[in-house]
């Protein structure tokens, strides 16, 4: 679940090598949303053959990331490469759109897509058994600090965010 920015790819590769896992054997990546800190490295996994699972509203931006890159560049300017690294398009055959409550089977594991808009209108939380990978919808915890709301993007919808938190609480 998640790739982080493309800058993290080599670190992920090294960590997997440390446990004798070849990064090229990863064939499925679930992303909560398309913001670069969560899926900016998805293209590298897709180049290795992985399928990338994402909300239908996010899929076009992984296939053609020009608008995403332009938007992020307006915020981060000259720091784009330093913060997020390179972003490339993903072949449409590797981008799989998923619906709310859809079950994705990967080997013997099942992940349930929970549509959780608010932080982003294409946000999905991924439920695995009793655990939920919440992306940014449930906030962020840095170190030993409290859980805080994630940095809000310009298109935040507070009402939908609250509804998403209630949905997660009921799971």
Regions found by a protein language model. Give the residues of each.
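Long, contiguous hydrophobic alpha-helical segments, chiefly transmembrane helices and signal peptides
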Residues: 39, 62, 76, 116, ...
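A structural alpha-helix within SAM-dependent methyltransferase catalytic domains
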Residues: 13, 17, 43-46, 162, ...
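Short, flexible active-site-adjacent loop segments at beta-strand->alpha-helix junctions, enriched
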Residues: 56-58, 101, 117, 130, ...
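Active-site HxH/HxHxD metal-binding segment of metal-dependent hydrolases
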Residues: 9, 18-99, 103
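Charge-patterned, long linear interaction tracts outside catalytic cores
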Residues: 98, 104-121
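Metallo-beta-lactamase
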Residues: 5-6, 110-112, 121-171
